[in-house]
C-alpha cells in the first residue's frame, strides 16, 4: 500500500454520520467505557475502501451507507506498552501501532439495520450511540484521541451543519 508507514499495522476507520451529523460510536466489550468508531485491519490484497465497507458491515451490520470523503494520508497512533504486547500476541506481529485510512460515510437508511452481533465476526461492541464530534474525541481512549481529533477536523466541512448534542440511542445486543 502506497506510503504505508513502516512498523504500523494497516487499518481502516469509518466515521459514520446520520442525518443529524451525529457520529456513530460503540463501546468495546473488552474495554468498558471506551467508545470508538468502527475500525479494523486491511486484509492482504484488499483495498482500503473495500476494507472500510467490510469492517462497517462486520462490526455494525450496516450496509446502507455512502462514502462521502476520505482522509488523503495514513493517520497513525502508537499502542501503549500493555496494549502493544497484547495485540502483537493476538495478531502475530511486531507493530508499533496502527496506520489508518479514514472514510467519512453517511447512513442512507434507517438505523434499524444496526446489529452489533451480525454473526459475521465475533462481536466487539456492547452498545452503540450517536454522539456529537466533541463527545467522540472525549470518550475515546487516550492514545486514539489525537487521531480522532484529526479525523473530525478533516471531515467537519462535509457535515451539513446539523450537529446537535448527543442523542443517546444505546442498544445492547
Where are the regions that the model predicts?
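Acidic, metal-coordinating catalytic segment for phosphate/diphosphate chemistry
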Residues: 1-19, 92-93
Amino acid at each position: 500500500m502506497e506510503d504505508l508507514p513502516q512498523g504500523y499495522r494497516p487499518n481502516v476507520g469509518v466515521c459514520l454520520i446520520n442525518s443529524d451529523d451525529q457520529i456513530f460510536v460503540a463501546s468495546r466489550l473488552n474495554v468498558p467505557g471506551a467508545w470508538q468508531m468502527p475500525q479494523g485491519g486491511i486484509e492482504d490484497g484488499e483495498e482500503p475502501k473495500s476494507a472500510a465497507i467490510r469492517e462497517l458491515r462486520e462490526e455494525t451490520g450496516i450496509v446502507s451507507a455512502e462514502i462521502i470523503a476520505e482522509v488523503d494520508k495514513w493517520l497513525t497512533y502508537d499502542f501503549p506498552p500493555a496494549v502493544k504486547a497484547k495485540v502483537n500476541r493476538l495478531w502475530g506481529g511486531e507493530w508499533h501501532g496502527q496506520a489508518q485510512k479514514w472514510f467519512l460515510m453517511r447512513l442512507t437508511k434507517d438505523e434499524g439495520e444496526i446489529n452489533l452481533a451480525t454473526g459475521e465476526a465475533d462481536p466487539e461492541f456492547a452498545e452503540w450511540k450517536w454522539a456529537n464530534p466533541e463527545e467522540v474525541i472525549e470518550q475515546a481512549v487516550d492514545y486514539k484521541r489525537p487521531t480522532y481529533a484529526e479525523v473530525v477536523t478533516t471531515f467537519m466541512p462535509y457535515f451539513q451543519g446539523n450537529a446537535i448534542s448527543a442523542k443517546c440511542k444505546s442498544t445492547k445486543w
